[in-house]
Structure formats: C-alpha cells, structure tokens
Amino acid sequence: RTGIIRRHIVEADTTVSMAAQAAEKALESAKMLPEEIDLLIVSTISSNVILPCTACEVQKQIHAVHATCFDLNAACTGFLFAYNTAQAYIASGMYKNVLVIGAESLSSLVDWKDRSTCILFGDGAGAVVLRAEEGESYHMVTHSDGSKGEALTCDTGSFMKMDGQEVFKFAVRQVPACIAEVMEHNHLMAEDIDYFILHQANRRIVEAVAKRMKVELTKFPMNLQEYGNTSSASIPLLLDEMNRE
C-alpha cells in the first residue's frame, strides 16, 4: 500500500556525515568551492547531538569557512522552509551563495515494533546550492496548522508516533490547495507544468493528490520506492536524481 520497496539505514554514517557528503556532491555539481558559500542551512529532526548544530558540524567537515550556519526543524516540510529561507536571504541581499541540506537518520527515532511508522521511514541526505541571479523571481506559498500537531509527534528521548489517517487526510486536502494557489499567482494551468515535486511520504498520498488535481500521475516523479520517507531529505534526493537523469 505504501509503494515502498526498500529503504536505507545508516550503520557507520550519521546525520552529519551524510549531510557533508551530500554537500560536497552539490558543490561539485554547481562547480563551486566550499569557501564560496556564505550561508549554510541544515533541515533535520534527527541531529546527532543537541549542540553544536548540524550545520556547524557540516561546515567543519567541508571547510565552508565563510558560511554562517544554522539548523531548521520543520519535519517533512523542513527542506522547503529551508529553501524558502535561503531564497529570502538571497533576495534581501544578505547572502549570495547558500547551501541548503536536508538530512535525516530517522532509523534512530523509529520504534521497530510500531508498524505505523517502522515500515515508512528511512535515512538519507540531499543538498542544493542556491545562487543570486539577476532577473530571477520566486513565489512561495506556505501555511502552518498547529492544531494538527498531534498527528505526528516525537517526544524527547522517545520514538515517533503517527496518526496515519490524519496525516493522509491533511496532505490530500492541503497539498492540492497550495499547488493551486501557486499556479493561480503565476497564471499557470496544470498542463503548463512539467513536473510536480512532492515530499516522498508514500505512494498513496502522491496518487491521491494527483487524482484530486485531475493530473496524470506521470507528472509526479517518485523515488520513495527506493528510499521510503526520508523527511527533510526526500525532495533534494528526488531533485538530485532528476538532475542527473
């Protein structure tokens, strides 16, 4: 039902080491040196330690000596919030070259006896480099609903707990609405869009979103069958695969 065939679980690696590897590959792809990065943001809910922040640890490993660093915690939406934050900093003129990383070791937060979560989540990291460019525009639509917070929780020193049905209903209702809002602002129709890049939660959610939007499923790339739900890492992992193809 989930569409997940396999997942990847860390053994020797950590959230920091995966994030650093993803960062190095992103910089290589962008043909940039680490010292050119002036802001480094890591989105994660599975840091190795509380302090120092994961972004500072990544900075140390990749030698991004000029980067300001901080972490961001927004769970599965984390990469998008980090991306939007990076874009806002670039638009303000404060920073020009920003490295955004989504990295998770969710296996450390999973109760392997709880089938509502243990069959879904995996470990991974992905990264993108954003650069200031003349004439580029970007429109974001973001919303939050704290009243739904109990649908997915993780107490300190405990495991993730999820109300799968509530998460499904919320995603299928709100994701199409946000997409419609973005398209309306940009005067676009679904047929104008090549791909809709969604968080890779599970296949049922992606299929339900496509159905509600009345858009063919081929416009919704998926790699969740290979990685499972990697929270903050899922969108940059998918973007990287599509970029390499």
Regions found by a protein language model. Name each.
Residues 1-12, 113-173, 177:
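Condensing-enzyme catalytic core mediating Claisen C-C bond formation in acyl metabolism
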Residues 16, 20-23, 27, 46-47, ...:
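Claisen-condensing/thiolase-fold acyl-transfer catalytic domains that form or cleave C-C bonds
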Residues 22-38, 177-194, 242-245:
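Phosphate/pyrophosphate-binding loops at sites that engage ATP/ADP/AMP, CoA/4′-phosphopantetheine
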Residues 29, 33-65:
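Anion-binding (especially nucleotide phosphate/pyrophosphate-binding) glycine-rich loop
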Residues 38-42, 68, 97-104:
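A short, small-residue-rich loop immediately preceding and capping a beta-strand
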Residues 49-63, 99-106, 150, 154, ...:
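Acidic-glycine-rich active-site phosphate/pyrophosphate-binding loop
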Residues 49-51, 78-81, 106-110, 146-148:
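Short, well-ordered, mixed-charge alpha-helical segments that flank or form enzyme active sites
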Residues 83-144, 238-245:
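Conserved beta-strand-centric core segments of catalytic alpha/beta enzyme folds
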